Amino acid sequence: MKKVLVINSSVSQLNNSDSLAMSNMFIEEYKKMNPNDEIINLDLNETKMSQKTLTRNNIAEYFNQEDSFDFIEQLKSVDKIVLNFSMVNWGIPAILKNYIDHITIANLTFTYKGSTDGNAIGLLSNIQDVQILATKGGTGTPNSAFTEYVKNIWEFLGAKVKSEIIINEMMDIPPYAEQSPIENLEKVKEQILKAAKNF
């Protein structure tokens, strides 16, 4: 039995989130293939930690048991991650950045000890795959920089990102702007179902 951590970092309302709809479809299909796996849900909108931004005024107490170490222990206990988010001002949501800052800690999730080439050694090698599900605006906005950043972070921490990144785009222009998240899934439905079966 595998443990799958599903991280929701969409800042849209639950009934209006395209990236959350992607995640829900993915997990629904995944559970059909893996009914005995444990699914753990983490909504960053509902955690105190993800509301805290690192500053010079709070750095002394920023990394603590409740906000950092408990979440790191969770990461070390799971086998796979499904992460959904949308592009916000050409970047990732602040709650996801705050989460990343809280769990990226030397000698806990990465280390330089034992490195022979000066590169960090990731300590989250237990994570066999990270599935990234993202949404963005029209084709005029950058397509991959925001997802590549997230991919690079997980790989830096030792996790494997074997699954293809799935991006559902053009959510803010007609006809997609008038459609429900479920309707907007049609463009990437086959990608999602295939990825879930191979995850």
Curated annotation (Swiss-Prot):
Positions of transmembrane segments: none
Catalytic reaction list: 2 a quinone + NADH + H(+) = 2 a 1,4-benzosemiquinone + NAD(+); N,N-dimethyl-1,4-phenylenediamine + anthranilate + 2 NAD(+) = 2-(4-dimethylaminophenyl)diazenylbenzoate + 2 NADH + 2 H(+)
UniProt keyword annotation of NAD present: yes
GO MF terms held by the record: electron transfer activity; FMN binding; oxidoreductase activity, acting on NAD(P)H as acceptor; oxidoreductase activity, acting on NAD(P)H, quinone or similar compound as acceptor
Cofactor: FMN
Pfam families: Flavodoxin_2
Co-factor: note: Binds 1 FMN per subunit.
Keywords attached to this entry: Flavoprotein, FMN, NAD, Oxidoreductase
EC number: 1.6.5.-, 1.7.1.17
Residues at which FMN binds: 10, 17-19, 135-138
Cited function: Quinone reductase that provides resistance to thiol-specific stress caused by electrophilic quinones.
Family listed: Belongs to the azoreductase type 1 family.
Subunit relationships: Homodimer.
Name under which the protein is recorded: FMN-dependent NADH:quinone oxidoreductase 2
Organism: Mesoplasma florum (strain ATCC 33453 / NBRC 100688 / NCTC 11704 / L1)
